[in-house]
Curated annotation (Swiss-Prot):
Gene3D superfamilies cross-referenced by the UniProt entry: DHBP synthase
GO MF, one example: double-stranded RNA binding
Name of the featured protein: Threonylcarbamoyl-AMP synthase
The keyword ATP-binding belongs to this UniProt entry's keyword annotation: yes
Annotated localization: Cytoplasm
YrdC-like domain location: 8-188
Lineage: Bacteria, Pseudomonadati, Pseudomonadota, Betaproteobacteria, Nitrosomonadales
GO CC terms, sorted: cytoplasm
An individual GO BP term: tRNA threonylcarbamoyladenosine modification
Job of this protein: Required for the formation of a threonylcarbamoyl group on adenosine at position 37 (t(6)A37) in tRNAs that read codons beginning with adenine. Catalyzes the conversion of L-threonine, HCO(3)(-)/CO(2) and ATP to give threonylcarbamoyl-AMP (TC-AMP) as the acyladenylate intermediate, with the release of diphosphate.
């Protein structure tokens, strides 16, 4: 186990597991999330299959700081960037231009990507210890209720995902989703 993993509570070998294309279930603000390395197209496709999700929906990224999201974000105006950063860390996800590095599996084939700097300490610590942003989508089969516990994740996905034990936050609803270009609230 690395010093970062032991200090932040990550499971031994988790970073290598994600690099190899593994999918994890981990606690977030309102439920367990499924995640993977956003740079790994095979892992993204695996996650989409696990959920039975429409590949055209895209997925969002979370991180402990904006710097980890930057490789996936395209050009932003200084005003737009400032508006976005004022809302973080917190439960606001912004839809922003995607960089050319952003895999189509992450964007759902769109020119935008959804990003958030999380205020949930365990999720932020996980991103910090792994040194990367993580894909974040609710831990459930598409159309079903998201898992609220590690045990529910294990029952739902078995050995197909590695479960990170922890507590979810106190939010009852998913994050607010806002289009940065238009200011339109896509999900309240």
């Amino acid at each position: 186990m690395s010093t970062a993993e032991s200090r932040e509570g990550a499971q031994p070998g988790l970073h290598a597991y994600l690099r190899r294309g593994g999918v994890i279930a981990y606690p977030t603000e309102s439920c367990y999330g499924l995640g993977c390395d956003p740079r790994n197209a095979a892992a993204l496709r695996r996650l989409i299959r696990l959920k039975g999700r429409d590949a055209g929906k895209g997925m969002l990224l979370i991180a402990d700081r904006y710097r980890r999201l930057q490789p996936f974000v395209g050009a932003l105006s200084p005003t737009g960037r400032a508006r976005m950063r004022r809302s973080w860390p917190g439960p606001v996800t912004w839809v922003v231009p995607a960089s050319r590095r952003c895999p189509p599996e992450l964007t759902g084939g769109r020119t935008t990507v959804a990003v958030r700097v999380t205020a949930h300490r365990p999720a932020a610590a996980l991103c910090r210890s792994l040194g990367t942003a993580l894909v974040s989508t609710s831990a459930n089969k598409s159309g079903h209720t998201p898992a609220k516990t590690a045990a529910q994740c294990r029952r739902m996905f078995g050995a197909r995902v590695r479960v990170v034990d922890g507590r979810i936050g106190t939010r009852r609803r998913p994050s607010t989703l806002i289009d940065l270009a238009t200011g339109k609230i896509l999900r309240a």
